[in-house]
Amino acid sequence: MRKTFIIIAGAALALAAVSCEKTLDEQVIDIAPETRALTKAGGNNWITALPDNAYASQLSIPGTHDAATGDGTTFSLGKTQSLTLQEQWNMGIRVFDLRPGYKKVRKGLFKYVNELHIYHGIVETRTSFKAAVKVLSDNLAANPGEFAIILMRFENDSPLYNKRDVWNSLMSSFLTSSDFPAERRIDFRPDLTVGELRGKILVLSRDAYASAPSTGAFVSGWSHSVDGTTNAVISGRNASATLQLQDYYSVENKEAKIASIKNYVDIASAAEPGVWTINHTSGYTGTIGSDSSIKQNAENNNVALYDYLTDSSRPCGSTGIILLDHAGVRSSGSYDIYGDLLPQAIIDNNFAFQLRLKGE
């Protein structure tokens, strides 16, 4: 038997609806954008309320693209976030796109060692991979009903620190060290449930650092095409799953990007348990990821997806994982980004349709 959950005024109530019905203050009226009703932001600890036997693949999870850039970067080019990792966690973000490369760090008068550090392309953030993992681990210790997902890849654009064998060794050692506590590790399976993931950090690495993942899984078949792919693979040590994904980030055609985002929401809604979906509103317009082109893209896509998710006529279902830029930012200068409203609309979606439950 399937169960339905919806949060209204902080309580879990049954909802027997097929369409995505909204409460009165969440309905979107087809009038001028500046006067339409908006969902309320404030989504921390939303996973705690979900049933243990809900399939993780069926959840709607907000995530941040190049999440650590909000903690500070060496310069503004490539800065995709405005909030720190802690602030992102506080608003309900649970998927964090982290791009660890490595650099030499001074440990003594004449001693330097290589350490994992987070970059976006050639842009260095002010956050080490160790520090980023600690933020998530500390929050899980304080909120054991939650879980986090790290989506990572080797950011090797630095001309000085781009040796894959060095990165492989550093990452293999880190993921089996006390800096990544054993109680946070979990092997990937397609049918992982919320209960199994509580208190864990699921690591999905787009680059293989060893012959088999130390924890989590490897992701292969990534695509940056406008059409995305439904044939990528998430491979754990003992099981693998189909991954459906859209990451068209160098956006030459705004309408095509929006159509692809919506298409992958629909694909996620129709997916069977065990099939995972990762969808990106993130990217930039034009040919370079400048501050203005990233924010323009966020305005284009975040608002369009927000409107789509809060349309009461849309059939309900999972959105999968959705990564966005400038989470938590309603507007910046002349750009209406909806970075606070879209994550909450994604979170709300978990409580507006019949979750598929393992064993029922």
Predicted regions span which residues?
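Short, flexible active-site-adjacent loop segments at beta-strand->alpha-helix junctions, enriched
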Residues: 65, 156, 207-209
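Surface-exposed substrate-engagement region within the catalytic domains
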Residues: 177-316
